[in-house]
Amino acid sequence: MADNDPLASALSGLDNAESVGHLEQTIQPASNEIGSVLEVFYDRGYVDGFQFVDDGKAGRFEVELKGAINECGAVKPRYSAGADEFEKWEKRFLPARDYGTLIVTTSHGVMSHYEAREQGIGGQVIAYVY
C-alpha cells in the first residue's frame, strides 16, 4: 500500500523514536522535502546529523537523534501564512511563544518561520517541532 504522506510518516517515526530513547532513526522513502525539513531540524539543533543513503530505490535518510525533540508533526492541511501571520500559527501549533519552530515552504525554499519572518516572506506551514 502506498504512503499518502511521506513527510507525516517521517515525522511520526522521528517522534516515536525520540519518545522511546533511540539514538538513530531510518526514514524511508527519502524525498527532497524530507531532506529540507531535516536540514532545518539540524540547523535549529533538534538532531545531531543525518545522511542520505542511496539504496538503488527511493533512498533513505539515517538520522542521528539527540533527545531534543519533545514533539514534531506534519501540519495538515498545509496552511498558507503571510510574513506577518506566523504568530497565529505559533499559537495553534507551538506550546509557548519563541519555543519551538514552524517549518515553512516558501518560494525561497524550506526554512523555519524565524528565517521567513526575518526575510519578510510568507509561505505554507508544513510541519512543527519543539
Swiss-Prot record:
Belongs to the universal ribosomal protein uS8 family. Gene3D superfamilies: 3.30.1370.30, 3.30.1490.10. GO terms for cellular component: ribonucleoprotein complex; ribosome. It comes from the Archaea. One of the primary rRNA binding proteins, it binds directly to 16S rRNA central domain where it helps coordinate assembly of the platform of the 30S subunit. It holds the Pfam family Ribosomal_S8. It comes from Natronomonas pharaonis (strain ATCC 35678 / DSM 2160 / CIP 103997 / JCM 8858 / NBRC 14720 / NCIMB 2260 / Gabara). Keywords: Ribonucleoprotein, Ribosomal protein, RNA-binding, rRNA-binding. This is Small ribosomal subunit protein uS8. One of its GO terms (molecular function) is rRNA binding. Part of the 30S ribosomal subunit. GO terms for biological process: translation. HAMAP family: Ribosomal_uS8_A.
